[in-house]
Amino acid sequence: FTLTTNGMLIDDDVIDFANREMSNVVLSLDGRKEIHDRLRVDYAGNGSYERIVPKFQKLVEARGNKNYYMRGTFTHANPDFTKDLFHMADLGFTELSMEPVVCAPEDPAALTAEDLKIVKDQYELLAKDMLRREKEGKPITFYHYMLDLTGGPCIYKRISGCGSGTEYMAVTPWGDLYPCHQFVGEEAYKLGDIWN
């Protein structure tokens, strides 16, 4: 199984469980504090960066050589997302992923046509920086650059296209179940809850 978490409820018991039972752990961090705290807030509206980063560092250190990824989302506020990836690397994380926001075009977080030039340039900057880090003996992994040219796509990816409902599910803090985190809140896609 894979556990994806925003880190808010991580404690020693969660770390022990995740490292014992989960083949992979995905830790949600959008990068720099000011970027992360724009959208990742608690019920009181306070940013979560200061609370989760030490928990993530502790979990990753305890995890040893088991799989994990730091997974962030870039938006209109940070089309220069390599700064956020490099920040994660500076925090000691080496397994990185950063994906574009998925939202309605009128949402203030939505990427614009003007952002795309900046975004495209980021991938070139990232590749060059990864080579530099490799030469310095401090490599990082970027999930979206991982290619398997010999094995090809897995059969379930050929059939289903993504893991929604077959490979993973989203569980809300209230226990509602959805086939994917992108469906959370869409009543038509609610599968049930953990209570029934």
Where on the chain are the PLM-derived regions?
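Flexible loop/turn segments at secondary-structure boundaries
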Residues: 9-11, 34-35, 77-79, 104-106, ...
